Amino acid sequence: VAICSPLLYSTVMTKRVCMQLVVGSYMGGLLNSLTHTCGLLGLPFCGPNVINHYFCDIPPLLQLACSDTHRNETLLLAFSAVIALFTLFVITASYMLILSVILKIQSDDGRKKTFHTCASHLTAITIFFGS
């Protein structure tokens, strides 16, 4: 909205919309973490309880379980794939819209300024998804 329709930004991005975006993000994170936590709570752990990692993550915990963890691994893969693909889709779609607006700008100077506004964020996104 800020690049494609800058004059409509304050009209579209009301406090209500911002709160809905924040609550939606938190609810998605809560659903993701609760699913994995409840799945891990149902697993029996026996034997060594030392995790040879810097921080406690789901795959090392699954290795300590002494029962079948296929369901947990499937949930982990599914949630990770859905979150990554949804994020990639939203970012790609927004940059396609931004690119179409940039290409419609008549002046070279205006096109350069608008592109340079997005270039640093686009570089960071490319590095993040590329690594």
Curated annotation (Swiss-Prot):
GO annotation, cellular component aspect: plasma membrane
Glycosylated residue positions: N72
Organism: Gallus gallus (Chicken)
Superkingdom of the source species: Eukaryota
Key words of the record: Cell membrane, G-protein coupled receptor, Glycoprotein, Membrane, Olfaction, Receptor, Sensory transduction, Transducer, Transmembrane, Transmembrane helix
PROSITE patterns: G_PROTEIN_RECEP_F1_2
Protein name in UniProt: Olfactory receptor-like protein COR9
Topological category with respect to the lipid bilayer: Multi-pass membrane protein
